[in-house]
């Protein structure tokens, strides 16, 4: 689904997007969801997550601040989402940095029907079984396109490897998204927020196919470009990013001709 159509549908339906995410970026993630046009809920208690996912249009799982109880909540929510057939989006934050994170990402992928995975080049390379260097939650180098292609093929789902250029692969397609701004890399949680936007678009489309994911990332990157104009630094940029997400979602026609999504080749 293309950005304009997704944003119009979000404005009409206001679907609930259920996040089980990390406590570092939870506020930014919730606000990015709201500004995009969906309704965020940040429920993580094991006792209620299945019920909450049962009312949602999409589920977004983020392992940024990981513990065993949270993993059990993610599995319970994911099973409920799978029963209802709603999209499940995974952000494998820090996969490759520690054994726990790598193992947890693998467990979620093996026990749940995940619709799309969004991460940096190092995280995606780790899931694809490629050599990768991940320091903390940051990727150090790596070929994002190669990682996305390999992971999409081996996992059998949509994979987005984000960076200066985002590569979205799946179903024999490979797309490149060139929207964005370097200041996005100066704000902690911007990657989490971009995955949240993917969840919003997936809720609108009812799926997380490569085109839907690519246009979600292009919309987010376009908001980053707009926010950077006049921003004094990372602090003002973060506030302006939310303003830009809201402005573009309120008037999708402003995206016309601005989204840079192209074919990245499939081999």
UniProtKB/Swiss-Prot annotation:
| GO biological process: one example | thiamine diphosphate biosynthetic process
Q: State which Enzyme Commission number(s) the record gives.
A: 2.7.1.50
Q: Where does substrate bind?
A: 42, 189
What Gene Ontology terms describe what this protein does at the molecular function level? Answer: ATP binding; hydroxyethylthiazole kinase activity; magnesium ion binding
Which cysteines are disulphide-bonded? Answer: none
Note the superkingdom of the native organism. Answer: Bacteria
The protein's annotated catalytic reaction(s) are:
5-(2-hydroxyethyl)-4-methylthiazole + ATP = 4-methyl-5-(2-phosphooxyethyl)-thiazole + ADP + H(+)
Keywords from the UniProt entry: ATP-binding, Kinase, Magnesium, Metal-binding, Nucleotide-binding, Thiamine biosynthesis, Transferase
- Family, per entry: Belongs to the Thz kinase family.
Role:
Catalyzes the phosphorylation of the hydroxyl group of 4-methyl-5-beta-hydroxyethylthiazole (THZ).
- In Swiss-Prot or TrEMBL terms, this protein is called Hydroxyethylthiazole kinase
- Organism expressing this protein natively: Rubrobacter xylanophilus (strain DSM 9941 / JCM 11954 / NBRC 16129 / PRD-1)
């Amino acid at each position: 689904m293309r950005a304009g159509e997704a944003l119009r549908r979000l404005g009409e339906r206001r679907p609930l997007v259920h996040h089980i995410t990390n406590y570092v970026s939870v506020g930014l993630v919730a606000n990015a969801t709201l500004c995009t046009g969906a309704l965020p809920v940040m429920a993580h208690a094991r006792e209620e997550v299945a019920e909450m996912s049962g009312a949602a249009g999409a589920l977004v799982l983020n392992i940024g601040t990981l513990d065993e109880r949270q993993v059990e909540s993610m599995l319970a929510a994911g099973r409920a989402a799978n029963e209802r057939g709603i999209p499940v989006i995974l952000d494998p934050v820090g996969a490759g940095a520690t054994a726990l994170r790598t193992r947890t990402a693998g467990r979620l992928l093996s026990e749940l029907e995940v619709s799309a995975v969004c991460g940096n080049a190092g995280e995606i390379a780790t899931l694809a079984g490629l050599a990768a260097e991940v320091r903390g939650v940051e990727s150090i180098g790596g070929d994002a396109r190669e990682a996305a292609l390999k992971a999409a093929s081996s996992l059998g789902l949509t994979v987005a490897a984000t960076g200066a250029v985002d590569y979205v692969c799946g179903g024999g397609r490979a797309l490149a998204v060139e929207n964005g701004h370097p200041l996005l890399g100066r704000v902690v949680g911007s990657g989490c927020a971009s995955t949240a936007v993917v969840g919003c678009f997936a809720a609108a489309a009812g799926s997380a196919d490569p085109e839907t994911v690519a246009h979600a990332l292009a919309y987010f990157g376009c908001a980053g470009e707009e926010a950077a104009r006049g921003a004094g630094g990372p602090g003002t940029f973060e506030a302006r990013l939310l303003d830009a997400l809201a402005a573009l979602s309120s008037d999708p026609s402003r995206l016309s001709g601005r989204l840079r999504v192209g074919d990245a080749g499939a081999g």
